[in-house]
Amino acid sequence: MTAILIPSMYAMSGVCAFAALHHGIAVMQRRVGKLHLLFALLSATILAILLTKAGAYQALTIPELVALRRWEVAAICLLFLLFPWWVAGFTGVRPRAFLLGSSTLWVLLFAINLGLPYGVQYVDLPSLTYFDLPWGERVVDLRVLQRSIWHNIGLLGILTAMAYSVHACRVQFRRGQHRRARALGWALGLFFGSILFNIAVNRGLIEFVHLSDLGFFALLLLMDLEMMRESRDQNRRMRDVLDRLPPAICLKNLHGHFQLANLGFAHLANADIHGILGKTDFDI
């Protein structure tokens, strides 16, 4: 048996952990804005989804399967709770009523999933069946062939988030932010394509395992590259501005008095500034 799926999911979870730490530390150091904080949280939820899904594929008992899938759905609820807000921050398209309504829906589904005996995924206690992949790997069959009403409501919420994200990307492109919109468009295409593939799998149209995990990872990877590129460009532009500023040790306030502006440059230039601080041109 050649194990490909499970090791790949653990490898992707490592990348997600790195992205969450990278963006989280950058936010704590105040090198980037709140959009990166949302992205760090998204990365953490994708990490949780990958780990719980990988565990569910290897579940040995039915209670273990139900518990892992319950926590997987909880992480998915958190992902789609945060995702529209991140899209709003990235594109500048902020329909407040939709964002608040979407958040309310996912908080409700999060609570219901934890309260139901078998979670949102299962109507009754599932059986432990297996799926043989083309390359010989055997995993637990996670297809949801009998769906609860809450599962369908969650699916409707996902489709609504998809529609909003595509609309926001389109508006962003029309506003002239072509590079940003193209990067987001590619990420959304892979992300939503994998979700639609999941829907086809759950309805028995395709005999395969879910691919949404790859879509989550593709979204994270592409947008991480784009956001890091923007941060580097912003830092480079700031350095260019600072490099063109004349070095200054003291500046004048509104009343014409000299005030210390750059102690480090004063030490570098070996300048004696104590005789002019607080004075005007007429006092020197």
PLM regions with names:
Residues 15-24, 77-86:
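Central hydrophobic cores of alpha-helical transmembrane segments in multi-pass inner-membrane proteins
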Residues 237-256, 263, 267:
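PAS/LOV and related PAS-like sensory modules
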Residues 265-276:
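PAS/PAS-like sensory domain cap-loop motif
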Residues 275-284:
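PAS-family sensory/regulatory domains
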